[in-house]
């Protein structure tokens, strides 16, 4: 039987991935499916860290344009990721997966504060670790948090789950002839200004040689396919 090509992964899930067709909030059926897909990886022996976005509940940048202080908006966005983290932890527990939720800032009584050595210890014990509250600082996206935590926990790859099959040369929702890339280099992404993630997050990954794999989490079984080394999605290295 073939083995996973990654021992430890950082899975970056957008908040929008959790909302399904609802347009807002959390779709319980999608949450449960994701929990079962993560469980499958754990049973294969893969160590899983998860970073969640919060865009399904709140977007700080959007309100900042309407006049809200950006720092306040970003703090609210960070709390939205904690709410998503609580939901994901609950879904994993219901799927009988041992999971720990950590926040970048103190939330006593709700979840643990992020601790690097503790996170590594839990991953080695095959517990899923969910990292919430972004980086804990405003002006940084959850993609930056995903790359940062991936580098810190020495993950083999950052898996960015999206609503499309991977990275295209142009927007596939607008252009029928958009070409899907199988592999790209960091330089190609920057030269062609391809939308993978924000530049701060992307350059952080590049500077630490952290491979990024973009794939469609909406496709059942895609996460397993990626971890098993199929050509699913786009690999950037």
UniProtKB/Swiss-Prot annotation:
It is found in: Cytoplasm. ATP binds at residues 12-15, 55, 59, 162, 168, 171. GO terms for cellular component: cytosol. One of its GO terms (biological process) is 'de novo' CTP biosynthetic process. Keywords: Allosteric enzyme, ATP-binding, Cytoplasm, Kinase, Nucleotide-binding, Pyrimidine biosynthesis, Transferase. It catalyses: UMP + ATP = UDP + ADP. Coiled coil: none annotated. Belongs to the UMP kinase family. Catalyzes the reversible phosphorylation of UMP to UDP. The gene is pyrH. The lineage of its organism: Bacteria, Pseudomonadati, Pseudomonadota, Gammaproteobacteria, Pasteurellales. GO terms for molecular function: ATP binding; UMP kinase activity. Residues 20-25 are annotated as: Involved in allosteric activation by GTP. Homohexamer. SUPFAM superfamilies: Carbamate kinase-like. This is Uridylate kinase. Pathway: Pyrimidine metabolism; CTP biosynthesis via de novo pathway; UDP from UMP (UMPK route): step 1/1. Allosterically activated by GTP. Inhibited by UTP. UMP binds at residues 54, 74, 135-142. It comes from Haemophilus ducreyi (strain 35000HP / ATCC 700724). Pfam families: AA_kinase (PF00696). Its EC number is 2.7.4.22.
């Amino acid at each position: 039987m073939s083995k996973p090509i990654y021992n430890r992964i950082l899975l970056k899930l957008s908040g929008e991935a959790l909302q399904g067709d609802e347009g807002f909030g959390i779709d319980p059926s999608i949450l449960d499916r994701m929990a079962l897909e993560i469980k499958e990886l754990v049973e294969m022996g893969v160590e899983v860290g998860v970073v969640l976005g919060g865009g399904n509940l709140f977007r700080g940048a959007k309100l900042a344009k309407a006049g809200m202080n950006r720092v306040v908006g970003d703090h609210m966005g960070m709390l939205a990721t904690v709410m998503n983290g609580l939901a994901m932890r609950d879904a994993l527990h219901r799927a009988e997966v041992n999971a720990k939720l950590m926040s970048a800032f103190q939330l006593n009584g709700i979840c643990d504060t992020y601790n690097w050595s503790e996170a590594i210890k839990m991953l080695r014990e095959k517990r899923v670790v969910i990292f919430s509250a972004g980086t804990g600082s405003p002006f940084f996206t959850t993609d930056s948090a995903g790359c940062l935590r991936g580098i810190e926990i020495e993950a083999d790859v950052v898996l960015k789950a999206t609503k499309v099959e991977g990275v295209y040369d142009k927007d596939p929702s607008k252009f029928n002839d958009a070409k899907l890339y199988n592999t790209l280099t960091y330089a190609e992404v920057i030269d062609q200004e391809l939308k993978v993630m924000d530049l701060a997050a992307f350059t952080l990954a590049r500077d630490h040689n952290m491979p990024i794999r973009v794939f469609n989490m909406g496709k059942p079984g895609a996460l397993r396919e990626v971890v098993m080394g199929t050509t699913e999605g786009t690999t950037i290295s």
